[in-house]
Amino acid sequence: MADDEVIRKRLLIDGEGVGDDRRITTLMKTFVKWCNSTDDDNDASYQKLLAQLAQCEFAMGKTEMVHAMNERETENYEKAYKEVEQSITHAYEEIATCKTNLQEAKRIRRNKQEYDALAKEITKHPERQETTRQISELEKDLNSLTETKESLVSKLELRKKQFYLLINTIHELQRMIDDEKTDEGTALSPQQSITSPGKVALMDT
């Protein structure tokens, strides 16, 4: 992409075709002069006419190269735009999954609170070996569920941050595409309206 930028700057050094109108006007004057020239001046006028025609053809080719380069850049932007859209869709899916997991974590938390209340009630009664073992197992399960819930919450927060970043990226990319198309339209419209009459005039002779 950096190489294309360098090429474009070199191609646009003429001012994006601003001098084409002057070239065509000069070419037409030279053509008329050649048509009215004497035999002595005929060859010199003809060579000058060919040189000016070559300059016009070069300017047209340069504009076509700029247009092709802009088309490639637009295609690259559109491709990147689609990739970002896919990433956003994937992020939405992951966020939906995380929300589901978060609801499950909340349910686990409610169960934990119920288990804690039950454990407190059990501890009020004389301890028994089996009851103590069950409570110990419940505590292990609850600790594991708590860790799972905390992990899910952290993952959800991370996905939210990634989603916001993707949204900002797509907005910036869209702005770049719009600016590129606007610049291209401004550069090409004058060129097309000037070149066509010149071509018709040459073909008629």
Curated annotation (Swiss-Prot):
Alphabetized UniProt keyword annotations: Coiled coil, Cytoplasm, Nucleus
Transmembrane segments: none
Main location: cytoplasm
Single GO cellular component term: cytoplasm
Location of the region described as Disordered in the Swiss-Prot/TrEMBL record: 181-205
Residue stretches in coiled coil: 68-158
Entry's localization field: Cytoplasm; Nucleus; Nucleus speckle
A Pfam family it matches: THOC7
Main function: May act as component of the THO subcomplex of the TREX complex which is thought to couple mRNA transcription, processing and nuclear export, and which specifically associates with spliced mRNA and not with unspliced pre-mRNA.
Identification of the protein by name: THO complex subunit 7 homolog
Species this protein is from: Nematostella vectensis (Starlet sea anemone)
